[in-house]
Structure formats: C-alpha cells, structure tokens
Amino acid sequence: MRILKIQTLRGPNYWSIRRHKLIVMRLDLETLAETPSNEIPGFYEGLVEALPSLEGHYCSPGCHGGFLMRVREGTMMGHIVEHVALELQELAGMHVGFGRTRETATPGIYQVVIEYLNEEAGRYAGRAAVRLCQSIVDRGRYPKAELEQDIQDLKDLWRDASLGPSTEAIVKEAEKRGIPWMQLSARFLIQLGYGVNHKRMQATMTDKTGILGVELACDKEATKRILAASGVPVPRGTVINFLDDLEEAIEYVGGYPIVIKPLDGNHGRGITIDIRSWEEAEAAYEAARQVSRSIIVERYYVGRDHRVLVVDGKVVAVAERVPAHVIGNGRSTIAELIEEINQDPNRGDGHDKVLTKIELDRTSYQLLERAGYTLNSVPPKGTICYLRATANLSTGGTAVDRTDEIHPENIWLAQRVVKIIGLDIAGLDIVTTDISRPLRELDGVIVEVNAAPGFRMHVAPSQGIPRNVAGAVMDMLFPNEQSGRIPILSVTGTNGKTTTTRLLAHIYKQTGKVVGYTTTDGTYIGDYLVESGDNTGPQSAHVILQDPTVEVAVLETARGGILRSGLGFESANVGVVLNVAADHLGIGDIDTIDQLANLKSVVAESVYPDGYAVLNADDRRVAAMAEKTKANIAYFTMNPDSELVRKHIQKGGVAAVYENGYLSIVKGDWTHRIERAEQIPLTMGGRAPFMIANALAASLAAFVQNVSIEQIRAGLRTFRASVSQTPGRMNLFNLGNYHALVDYAHNPASYEAVGAFVRNWTSGQRIGVVGGPGDRRDEDFVTLGKLAAEIFDYIIVKEDDDTRGRPRGSASALITKGITQVKPDARYESILDETQAINKGLDMAPANGLVVILPESVSRAIKLIKLRGLVKEEIQQQNPSTTVIDNQNGVASSSVINTLL
C-alpha cells in the first residue's frame, strides 16, 4: 500500500458538517486492490493479536465485534486502515469514532477518512495504521514493540499539543454558549468570537487584563508593600540579593520558622516553607536562586493553604490546597504508596490532567527526614506523610472546595485586594486555620496575588463541588448573553462567486459597517486591500474573522478550499449557492456534477438554524439543497412563473424575483421592488442575465440580514462591472471604433453566459480569444471549442502560461477539435502565447467589432488593452432604447406593489 496524499480538515466539510476535525488520506492499495481480507492468509489472526480492542468496533453489522466479523468475512484494506487508525488514537487516550472509506473513480485508490482530536496525532495514526496492516499482510504480525512505540508517540503528540485544563474549561464553556473560538499561533492563545466582537485569552489572562496589574502581581515584594500600606494582612518579609544578607533577613522577620522563595516565581517553583535551621535556609536560598536573582524571606505562618479566585471583581470559587502526600496502610513502603497513587488515571504529567503525578525533589526528602522516614519506610495505617511543602497542584497537591464556607468579610477583603492590584482575574493565596472566620481573628495572611491563576482546583476538586469558574469569565467577556459573533455571509457556486461577493460587500457598506471580504483576487477590509491573490479558502477567512475592526464578513467560498481544509468558520448567518455547473471535474476525486453539488452544499448546510440558505431556484441541484439544510430557505429566480418559488412564497417564504424588468423581493402578499435591471450598471443595461441573477442573490442575502431596500438599491446603483470593482468580470472597453470585453470565463457555463451577453450587445463581428485551465478534462476543452464556435465569428485559441501538467498544445488541439465539430468551416487560428494571442485579436478588430478576451491573467489583458492608447472603460448606464431581458411594459414604478404570486 502507498499513501498518495494526506489532508487535514478543520471545519465543516464534504464528509461531515458536524465533525470538523478529519484526516483525509488518499490510499493506493496497489497489489491489494482486488484482495479482500479473508483471502490474505493469517491476516485476521494477526490483526486480532495486535489490536484485540477492535472487538469493540460495531461497524455496519451494528453489534459488538461487528467490524471483526467484516474482516473475517472479507473487507477491503482501506476500510481496515480506517478502523485501525481510529483505534490507535483511542488507545492513546483520544476518543474518536467517526470514519469513512470510499473508493475513487480510479480503481484501487481509496479515500480513507478518520476523525482526530490532535492534528499531528491524526496524521501519525493514519500512517501507523498503514504500516501495521502492511506488516500483517507481509509477516502475519505487527511487532509488539513497534505498536507500543506508536501508542507512546501518539500520547506524546496529544500531551504536547493539548490545551491546558484552564484553557480547556474556557473553551468548553464557550462551546456550550455557542461562542465560536479558534486557536491562534501560541499554544494557549485563543480567540473567542469573531471580528469586532472577539476577545482573546492566553491561559487565564484576557485582553482586558492590565499589564500594570500583571507586572505588580509578578513582583511579590512590591505587591506586599502596596497591600500592607492599604491595611491588608500580609506576611512580614524582605528581599535580599546575596547569601550574606540572609542571616540579617531572618532576624528581621522574627526568626524561624521562615519561608524562602524567588521574587518573581510561580507554580511553587523554588519555594521552601517551614524552614527551621541555618542549613535548611542556605539550601532553600540556593534553590530559589535557580529561579530568580532576588529572593524573598518571609515569616512562616501556620495554617491551611487556600486559593481564592476572583473574576471581574467577585469571588467565584475557593479551594483549600493540600500538599502532595500519601497515607500509610501499614503494609506498603512510601515509595510503593507514591507509585500506587500515581497510577490514578486522573493524574498526569504537568497540567495534562486534573491532577499531577507526584515527583520528589529536595524538599520531599527533607520532609521525610524531619518526620523520621525514608522512601523504604512503612508508615502506620492512617498516617499522613507529606511529600511537598507547598500545596500547588502542579507539584502533586490536591484540592478541596471551600466556596460555600468562606466568611463574608474574607470575600470583601479578597475583592478589595484584587481591585488594589488591578486585575480582572486573580488567584489569592491565603493562609489561615479556618477560612470561615475573618482573617484578622486568626492571624491569617494573604501570601500572594497571582495573575493567570489556574482553574484546575476549582473545576475538578478532589473533594467538594466543581465550580463553573469559566462561566464567570464568559459573563465578564460577553455580558448579557452576547455571542461574540458577527454576521458571516458565505458565497459559493460555479460561476459568479466573486462578483456576488463584491456586490454583497458593497451593499453592506451602505449600512456604514466595516465589511471584510475575500475573493479570488484578494482579501479586503473596508476599502483597502489586505492581501492580493486567490483568497477563497479558510486561511483567508481567518484573516477577516480575526480582525478586530470587521463588523461583517462576506466570504467567497471556493470548491478547492472546502476540499483541502473545510470551511474557515463553524457556521454562517447566510449561505448563498449561485449555481452548480461542470467545472473542476476530475480534480480532488470530484468526478460528477452531483458530487460537485454535494461539495458546494456544505455552504448551505453550515448555516445557523435561524439563518438563511439563499438558493437558486432555477438550478435543480441547488434548489435540492433545501432538503439538506436546517436553515431557513430563501430562493432567487429569473423566472417569475417558477412553481417552486410560488409555493415557497405561499408558505410564507421570501424570494428575490426578476419580474417585469425589475429586481424584486417577494414576501407574503407583497413585492418590494428594488430597481429596474437597466438602472443597475452591473447588468450592462439589463443585457447580462447572469449578472441580473448575481444581483438577485446579493440583494436577497442582504435583505434577510435586515439591510433595508433603500440601502440595497443604493448599493446596486453604485456598483459597476469595472476594473476597480469587478476586475475580470465583464470589463468593457471602448477603443474608438471597436470594443474589447475582458471576462474570466473558463468553463462551459460561463462561456454560455458571456455568449448570451455578446449576442445581445452587438451585431458587429465578434472575435474571441479563448482558452481554459490545463487541469480540466479533455471533454471540457472540446465543449469550450463547441461553444466558442457558436459565439464568435473568428476564434484565436491560446493556452495558459501554467498548463497545470498538461503538455503544451494539448488544450489548444482539443478546443479546435470542438470548434470544427460544430462548424467545420470556422475561421480560427492557434496562438499558444496569451500575450501574442490578445495582441492579434486587438490588431484585427474591425470597425464596430467586439474582441472578447477570456484570459488566464486578467491584469495582463487589461494592460495590453490600455497600451492601445486612449481607452475608455465603458460603464453601462440607463438607456431607454436598451432591450432588457424579459422586460415587459406597463408596470407601475412604485417600490412596493401588491403581488399575485
């Protein structure tokens, strides 16, 4: 077997709308292409020996052991690889269950789809599954050592990339509230919400957390001085920089017992408490110097260690922290008790799980020695042996919830302290013998104020009630049930995507909002180009959704991006599907128009239930998407007599209809007339029906988002098929005694659309400079030739600079084949170089003629036209003598009239 390609999906996709995290592996079975598993000697036995846990996979039989039944009876190797990849992840602690295996149009090549939690782990699992299956085919077994290494590698990948427990709690709460989130470049840096409404967090610091507060909290001594000056009970202490000053510092704080800790440490690193001798003090000083140059010496206060969490000025949780310890059973040594407690599945390395495994350090041995024990000692039953002086969870400690026990005065004091320091989220370390009584009564003290406090002890205490502290954070960042979202409008289809996206963005600008939009020619925010290029995939969508100024996102969503990575967002408010026609077939294992329709349907299916799928009622494949989506439906149609639309409106639906020469919104008993087509520059005076359809779709998408009819009308009237607003989309130039038209038509449907306009526009001679992308099918090029023969009087066949792997001259030959099939006496020539072909077309243009250029490079075509001298770009305006498609006379011009639909 051979892996041909591995792709990672991260959003709604062709395989699943709900499951975003999928690996798609293109697998060539090679010699196993026609060999089911039951025909491979020893394969079943070898697979069961390697992975007996596959017994739990149901598969199509729908019962325990169902998958292994399939293997015994005979199934193809791609299917087995799918299940093995899922099981390897499961054994590494990643609970995944979704998978699909489908044969492609190429015999023996399969697409194997597996769910993942961690991207790198998912890709590793796919490769390991192929290795495992191939090994069993070749040798009858997969070495146990290799399997163990695979599982360990997967565990390491999962641990290294997983969100920390605090971040995970925040993300889960965001998902619960329907707030979208995304992980940014740093491991714990996340974004909650989109655009102008988004917030960012790193660990438990928010973008509202003041840097002065953080800096102050990190300077333990400065914090203590400020709090002491405010009458807050804090430990007596001082800061030293040299060992020679230690003895004097001990005297200053009142003698032993003392605490020594680094000035700017965290997570308990370098801290030693309950120091009772000079030898211990020297060792503690050296340990603290490993973390910081400046050392704090404080008086040691006896009591219980409490963490009080304050969010947005309010105490939301309190936990008593208990240092790492074991409890004797009268039989086991301390070393054995530690090993036993570390087997707890809730304990992991670092912050992986709710508890951390106990690891010993210098202070551990000191504590044992002070208690008269060694690791080989057997403590009596019930005896507590402390292994750490500090109670941090990161050193193996545990937590007991005390939220309901804290005294009101202590709540007031904690909230006051956090305001003094200036933090929105803070964790206070309080030492007192009883948190239910005021600190002042028990000589309790506030030891530290921590920025970015951990949430583990509160969301998963060892004893007591788990507290939803992440909910308090969400309430602070998104008050009054705010969602953090901005309107997202996604536009897809075979043709018209860029024009419709630009028009929709232009209409939305009439509302005064900042619009971010992506197209095949670039990413834009407001009136400014952010990045040029074909930016119709998820990465470009993220640029818009991460921008803090964007209030509305209009995203052109192309086929390629959906296939490669899925959508760049979880859900949209509006999903527009313009049409589905033959293009890109045979690429990415999308071989039929129906498969292409299923791919583009992802946009319609990913709309929020309270949003709208805007669908073309005149395209049966697009109209059928209404059955797949949970969103509301809005249709647009060029046919005012559409039965589908009539029934939809009767049921209370909304539609955009081209009727009597008007673009109209129809809802219930009323028709809201927006504008006559001939008044809309984009429609070329009403002579470009495909542009009318694009305008209908954009108007309807804006309308269902509560953009007013007046604002829609203003947008339509001021948007032009020009180089500045729609480069490469029906750009018409007046070159004196002839005209040139530039359009990025590159598939049969777009050729037909351009042809309809050309026939309406001129009766003069029509010259076409035609071609197509090299990665299309042979039959597609033949079809382009046939259409060109029907449209143009003279044809110049050229090829793209980038032939996309096709031999030079091949595409041209296929196009000319199509030309001669339709018109054997057609006038044509082949000039493969695009620049030469365009110049030839312009050179031979007759008076009153039209040169139609369908280029690979729009910018090059426009530049060559402008080199011709004085060139005027024509923008079609209202023309009373213009023939409008399907125009009817005698219609009232009011914007709202009663309708009979």
Swiss-Prot record:
Listed EC numbers: 6.3.2.29, 6.3.2.30
Keyword Nucleotide-binding: yes
Classification via PROSITE patterns: ATP_GRASP
Classification via InterPro entries: ATP-grasp, ATP-grasp_RimK-type, Cya_phycin_syn, Cyanophycin_syn_N, Mur-like_cat_sf, Mur_ligase_C, Mur_ligase_C_dom_sf, Mur_ligase_cen
Entry binding sites for ATP: G493, T494, N495, G496, K497, T498, T499
Molecular functions (GO terms): ATP binding; cyanophycin synthetase activity (L-arginine-adding); cyanophycin synthetase activity (L-aspartate-adding); metal ion binding
Catalytic activity: [L-4-(L-arginin-2-N-yl)aspartate](n) + L-aspartate + ATP = [L-4-(L-arginin-2-N-yl)aspartate](n)-L-aspartate + ADP + phosphate + H(+); [L-4-(L-arginin-2-N-yl)aspartate](n)-L-aspartate + L-arginine + ATP = [L-4-(L-arginin-2-N-yl)aspartate](n+1) + ADP + phosphate + H(+)
Residues of the ATP-grasp domain: 224-478
Pfam families in UniProt: Cyanophycin_syn, Mur_ligase_C, Mur_ligase_M, RimK
GO biological process: biosynthetic process
Function summary: Catalyzes the ATP-dependent polymerization of arginine and aspartate to multi-L-arginyl-poly-L-aspartic acid (cyanophycin; a water-insoluble reserve polymer).
Subunit relationships: Homodimer.
Family: In the C-terminal section; belongs to the MurCDEF family.
Name of the protein described by the UniProt record: Cyanophycin synthetase
Organism, as annotated: Trichormus variabilis (strain ATCC 29413 / PCC 7937)
